[in-house]
Amino acid sequence: KLKRSLKVDAVLGIILLGVVALLTNGTLPAGEIQNVDAQEIIYGFKTVEFTENAKFDIQISPFSSGVNTILVKVSDFENNPIYDSNQIKVKIANPSKNISPIEIPMQIIKDNNNIPVEFQGELTFGFSGEWQLEIESQRTENANESKILNVLVKPRLENIQTQIVEYEFPEKAKPLYPLYDGNNAIWISDPSAPRLWEFSLDTQEFSSYSFNGLSTMFLTMDNTGKIWFTDSPRNQIGYIDLETKEITTKTIPKLGPVISDNKPIFIQADFDGNIWISIVNKNKILKYLPDDDVFKVVELPERDSFPFALSIDSDGNIWYTATGTGKFGKIDPNEGKITQYSKEIPLEGPEFLLFDKNEDVWIAEHTGTAITKFNPVLETFENISVPDEEALPFGMTFDRYGNIWFAQHVVDSIGVYDPDNNNLKEIPIPTEGSFTQFMTSDKNGKIWFVEQEGNKIGTVNMIEIPVDISQIKTIDDVEMKYTEIASPLIALGIIFTALFYVKSIYDKRRLNSLINS
């Protein structure tokens, strides 16, 4: 009996070793798993919507511009057919483009007394963007059930063909920060000289405007169309009147401790035309009221905060990054109240921030090689790591599809992240040693970036590639994943290990019993 028991133990041991070998050799390294996940593109849109008395199961494939197939199941909340309904109306519209609702012909493809009625139709999204979808279940004995939802149709990053076009400055400069003025021109600061550059999007020509100072660093536009700038070495701010092209400057008062000079860095206009300036070395943010010619001081709550970037939300609050403490916060412009936010582990070099259409805050962690999304309502963080550990992500902006683009400072490529599909991609910059730090978007959502060492301004031309339906993978495709194999095997391994342990105790006692007898 003992001999037979040992044989069984040996066989089970070999099986367990085989399972361990399978799990070990079948696992990709952590980085490779992330790469595979990032490269996997799944097409399609699927949602469940409810009305007062009905449930709509909606699927759209491939969910891209062009021809799509829509499937709709209509049922009650228990997934039973609605007894007095066997017709459905589907309409699509695009109010932003003045496209009125267009009815989509729908046909019944499944009609059984025991399952919900399923309808199918063919709809065409003429272009990417936000579309309005209206679905109405027509009933004979009750009021119709209808649902309206907005759907964002956009290409995946792999379906966007990009081409970078560069324009060289007419003379040697150190272009830093670009700003779109809303009138088909990009304005660029120049830390190497007291001047502002204007780049015409119509003619692709440069113009420069000089003033009495030392440099221009960061730019903002107020509600009257003036473009303001910081001149850090001269401790002043200024603005250019876009009609007359005249530049006016204003000296910033000395701030304590006066043993060191002020270092004004970032600048941001609010909705009332006031100008906010971060003083990076004095732990202060200034509010300048042009009408009263008065500076007000906002003292940050922690020493060595090193306030850097500024931005404004839809309520008019001024947000800032505190590079020294790894935090960020907002200032109520009326009450002056400061609210600070931080992760359990402080952010690494937060040096730029901006808001998306949902009022989420995006923060570039300059030394943390990541961009981080912060939800101000839930106060939650989502971290997106960039592929290159040397990248130093910096300035950010959004394209017409809602993708977030970010500069990578010391790497000759710019990054783009699709927050709707959780996909990230890098676009190489042709110029070597470009040193790209900041970027902006024009009214068409076209990306523009500045190459400080390349002495160029660049843009990204994007062409949407049609989706080949026959070659795509949809959300309904079934695939055996590694975790689906590994999890049961690991569980079995734990169970068998426990059984081995119990059996070894039992065998030891039995052997002791035999020896003693």
PLM feature spans:
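Beta-rich, blade/repeat-based domains predominating
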Residues: 170-182, 212-223, 255-271, 302-315, ...
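A short helix->beta-strand "capping" segment at the edge of beta-propeller domains
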Residues: 158-172
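Alpha-helical transmembrane segments
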Residues: 493-508
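Blade-level signature of beta-propeller repeat domains, shared across WD40, Kelch, NHL, RCC1
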Residues: 429-489
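N-terminal soluble domains immediately following signal/targeting peptides that reside
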Residues: 21-29, 37-162, 239, 278, ...
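Cytoplasmic C-terminal tails of single-pass
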Residues: 508-517
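Conserved beta-strand positions in repeat-built beta-propeller and related beta-rich domains
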Residues: 187-192, 229-235, 275-281, 318-325, ...
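Short loop/turn segments that connect beta-strands within beta-propeller blades
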Residues: 200-204, 241-245, 288-293, 332-336, ...
